[in-house]
Regions:
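Non-heme Fe(II) oxygenase metal-center motifs and adjacent flexible, charged/small-residue loops
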Residues: 1-164
């Protein structure tokens, strides 16, 4: 992972392997990963088949400007006629294509403010994914739980290819 500057000091302590099949109705509901234990970066390898990662964020009372479809009148935006309109929205969802054999790093606002999900409709073929997590600052050197963090890292480095 040292090929990518964003992952230069990434030291995973957890690997989660996921195997999804459309026949089983596989999906991941929208969620935020724990921020107390897991660190700033979530790293995921999407293998075997393409899919779509859905990122959503609640935006109560927000106005979303949309381009008006053809046949709709132009809207008055700040005194100027523009081909857009305002729509009150409860949630914003962004669809991110994940090609086969792609690497995804969630960090910053994408990690802490946007929920991520894989909807059933986006599992069209068998999908295998490996997600890696690092420890949060609390469990790293200088953190309140650094001794426990060192033990967790030691255990993770002892993995020999068999589930514990």
């Amino acid at each position: 992972m040292g090929l990518y500057p964003i992952l230069e000091d990434f030291r995973p302590v957890e690997q989660c392997n996921l195997d999804y099949c459309p026949e089983r109705g596989s999906a991941i509901d929208p969620h935020l990963d724990d921020a107390w234990l897991w660190g700033e970066r979530l790293v995921s390898l999407n293998l075997l088949s393409p899919t779509v990662l859905s990122m959503s964020r609640e935006a109560p009372g927000s106005l979303l400007l949309c381009l008006a479809p053809s046949g709709f009148p132009e809207a008055l935006v700040e005194g100027v006629m523009a081909p857009s309109r305002s729509v009150l929205c409860q949630e914003v969802e962004v669809a991110i294509p994940l090609p086969r054999r792609s690497l995804l790093v969630l960090t910053g606002a994408a990690r802490h403010q946007w929920k991520h999900a894989i909807h059933r409709r986006h599992i069209e073929a068998r999908r295998v994914c490996a997600t890696f997590r690092e420890l949060s600052a609390e469990f790293r050197p200088g953190g309140r739980q650094q001794e426990l963090g060192q033990e967790l890292l030691r255990i993770s480095l002892s993995f020999q290819g068999r589930p514990m």
